[in-house]
């Protein structure tokens, strides 16, 4: 029975190009969509750019352009990636559109009428220089647990501590460096903790769709059970802050001037907005298509890092706004390289654009991913050696090899005509039964199982072909009797029929190659459908090369840093280039000593200098002038240890003689990066000790 499916992938954030994780998710969804279409189902496959939020606003501001211009720039890149990897969305949209504004505001009003929106006054850090409230990512400070500097406002990257921004020691704005102040503001909350939401989510997260497929994979269901609460019935869900204060690039909240929807509210609504835009183009009834009581199945492909939003907030929002809830949430893991997290600095980052630019076949990657992806929430590992071996062995050595060998005999000796001597073919009969298992594996997203079964049949075809030894029969074909000719034609025809069946089964994974096989090799006027696997071909065109082997050297090129990064100007530590190299003998000429600041006072008539009286362990005190007045109060330096250039020639100044130089650090551009930092040795160092 034909089904109607509405399929989406997670929306990429429109402040950057696609990365390999996006491509993996789109390939996974595209394979599924193609397999469902081949089964005769109607699929509406849409995507969109996630175009709102503070990061986009701030990046655009930094570049001196509008947020809309920034979003448009990245949107213009999308087709190059999608077309390059044969990913075929029906429609690509944006969340910064009239459809998304209208739908987001409609859903909000519906939730408000249900009593599920509540206004509360909350206290947040506010940047008085920037004039905006700060999200956790824009607040930095000292970790309250391990005292590591420059940690973000919600967690420490050094010790792993999780905390509230207000717990940071000496917090500062990552945008301006200013000390943030606590300020109150009214925010809007979606009451996810409401008993109605909790009861619904307990049912939905454990439920199944019309096909009997669970809404959530087992691993995801287990995670939502943790979030929803234990058997004691204690509620664990917190309410969700769905608002942000101006300035903010987003959708305004109705009847709330200066308030905007948090990007995570309007982003998933973008799925619906994209479908609505698509329906307008195609003349489809959007409301009928997404009627909660209608037959359309709503399916989302997402990564494991955004489960919370999609498995709790999203279905609850839709349910109590009177809209259709998702039928299936398909969650995948991340990509690793040789068992490790990808890292550009370690040379293990994969740029999808570089993959295409160096001439690698997109269908190599589609096949490799399919061979490793399954329906579980597992990371997919890209191993370069395995990639080369699997593509060359499976696709070229097994699959394409069948056609290249068998078609040559048919073209040379039978003018492209295929003929089958007898009605029985044990291999074909076996594969006819196996085909249903392969189709089911694709529908269940068990792509690795489907690929294994397909390649196992390719092995059987090659083994049967080798056992028959058609090249032996072909040697004397000119003088051969009719039975021998018929036998040769039958062997090669059945091998090509098997190749066609394999091509049908691989079509969701290798759409471009399968289309060439259908149209160029077998003369079809349409791409393959599942039923074509059992149809015996009658003619074959002269064989044309279908796929190159992977050159391992390409993998070396793939993992090189992108050209733009390689040619970028070298980083300037502290705002200036490193000085020319010196020898150890040059360094030895500089006598650096520990000194204790015995006294410190301002210099009358100078706006920059402080006069330091130093003990360097010589039995006398030294007098040193230092331009650090803007950074330090004299009394704060008394008793501190510092480092002195002790053998610097005395310098006669307007205010007296300076007998050395105290070491301090600063940025080359003091206006852009203000701050002077006197070097202070660790406790235990004594005046007079040499710094070596």
Curated annotation (Swiss-Prot):
Stated family: Belongs to the class-I aminoacyl-tRNA synthetase family. MetG type 1 subfamily.
Pfam families referenced in this protein's UniProt entry, alphabetically: tRNA-synt_1g, tRNA_bind
Catalysed reaction, written as an equation: tRNA(Met) + L-methionine + ATP = L-methionyl-tRNA(Met) + AMP + diphosphate
Position of the signal peptide: none
Taxonomic source organism: Bordetella bronchiseptica (strain ATCC BAA-588 / NCTC 13252 / RB50) (Alcaligenes bronchisepticus)
Membrane-spanning residues: none
Domain annotation tRNA-binding: ranges: 586-692
Name recorded for this polypeptide: Methionine--tRNA ligase
Top enzyme class: ligase
HAMAP family registered for this protein in UniProt: Met_tRNA_synth_type1
Cellular localisation: Cytoplasm
One CC-aspect GO term: cytosol
């Amino acid at each position: 029975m034909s089904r109607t499916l509405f399929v989406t992938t997670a929306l990429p954030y429109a402040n950057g190009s696609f990365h390999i994780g996006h491509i993996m998710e789109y390939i996974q969804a595209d394979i599924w969509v193609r397999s469902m279409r081949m089964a005769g189902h109607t699929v509406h496959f849409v995507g969109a750019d996630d175009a709102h939020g503070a990061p986009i606003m701030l990046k655009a501001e930094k570049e001196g352009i509008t947020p809309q211009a920034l979003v448009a720039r990245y949107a213009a890149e999308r087709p190059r990636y999608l077309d390059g990897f044969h990913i075929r969305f029906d429609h690509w949209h944006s969340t910064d559109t009239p459809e998304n504004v209208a739908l987001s505001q409609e859903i909000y009003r519906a939730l408000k009428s249900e009593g599920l929106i509540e206004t509360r006054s909350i206290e947040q850090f506010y940047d008085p220089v920037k004039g905006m409230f700060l999200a956790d990512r824009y607040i930095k400070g000292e970790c309250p647990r391990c005292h590591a500097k420059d940690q973000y406002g919600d967690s420490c990257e050094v010790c792993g501590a999780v905390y509230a921004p207000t717990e940071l020691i000496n917090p500062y704005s990552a945008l301006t460096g200013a000390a943030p102040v606590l300020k109150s503001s009214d925010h809007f909350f979606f009451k996810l903790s409401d008993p109605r939401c909790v009861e619904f989510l307990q049912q939905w997260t454990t439920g199944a769709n019309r096909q009997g497929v669970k809404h959530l994979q087992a691993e995801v269901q287990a995670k939502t059970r943790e979030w929803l609460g234990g058997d004691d019935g204690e509620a664990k869900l917190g309410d969700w802050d769905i608002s942000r204060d101006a300035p903010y690039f987003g959708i305004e909240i109705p009847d709330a001037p200066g308030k905007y929807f948090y990007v995570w509210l309007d982003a998933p609504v973008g799925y619906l907005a994209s479908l609505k835009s698509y329906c307008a183009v195609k003349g489809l009834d959007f409301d009928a298509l997404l009627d909660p009581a209608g037959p359309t199945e709503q399916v989302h492909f997402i990564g494991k890092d955004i489960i919370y939003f999609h498995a709790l907030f999203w279905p609850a929002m839709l349910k109590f706004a009177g809209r259709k809830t998702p039928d299936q949430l398909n969650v995948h893991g991340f990509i690793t390289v040789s068992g490790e997290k990808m890292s550009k600095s370690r040379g293990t980052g994969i740029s999808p654009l570089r993959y295409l630019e160096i001439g690698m076949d997109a269908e190599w990657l589609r096949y490799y991913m399919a061979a490793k992806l399954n329906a579980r929430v597992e990371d997919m590992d890209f191993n370069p050696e395995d990639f080369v071996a699997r593509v060359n062995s499976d696709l070229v050595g097994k699959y394409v090899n069948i056609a290249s060998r068998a078609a040559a005999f048919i073209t040379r000796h039978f003018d492209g005509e295929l003929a089958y001597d007898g009605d029985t073919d044990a291999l074909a009969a076996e594969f006819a039964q196996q085909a249903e298992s392969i189709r089911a594996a694709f529908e269940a997203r068990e792509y690795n199982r489907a690929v294994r079964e397909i390649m196992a049949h390719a092995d059987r075809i090659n083994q049967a072909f080798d056992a028959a030894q058609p090249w032996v029969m072909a040697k004397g074909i000119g003088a051969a009797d009719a039975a021998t000719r018929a036998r040769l034609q039958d062997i090669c025809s059945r091998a090509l029929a098997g190749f066609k069946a394999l091509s049908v089964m691989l079509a969701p994974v290798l759409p471009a190659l399968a289309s060439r096989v259908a149209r160029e090799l077998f003369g079809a006027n349409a791409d393959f459908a599942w039923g074509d696997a059992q149809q015996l071909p009658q003619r074959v065109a002269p064989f044309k090369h279908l796929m190159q082997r992977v050159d391992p050297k390409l993998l070396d090129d793939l993992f090189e840093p992108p050209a733009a990064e390689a040619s970028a100007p070298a980083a300037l530590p502290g705002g200036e280039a490193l000085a020319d190299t010196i020898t150890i003998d040059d360094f030895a000429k500089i006598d650096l000593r520990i000194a204790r600041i015995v006294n410190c006072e301002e210099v009358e008539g100078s706006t920059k200098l402080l006069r330091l009286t130093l003990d360097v362990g010589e039995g006398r005190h030294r007098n040193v002038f230092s331009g650090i007045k803007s950074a330090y109060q004299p009394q704060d330096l008394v008793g501190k240890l510092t480092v002195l250039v002790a053998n610097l020639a005395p310098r006669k100044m307007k205010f007296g003689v300076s007998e050395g130089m105290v070491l301090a650090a600063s940025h080359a551009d003091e206006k852009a990066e203000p701050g002077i930092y006197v070097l202070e040795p660790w406790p235990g160092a004594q005046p007079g000790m040499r710094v070596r």
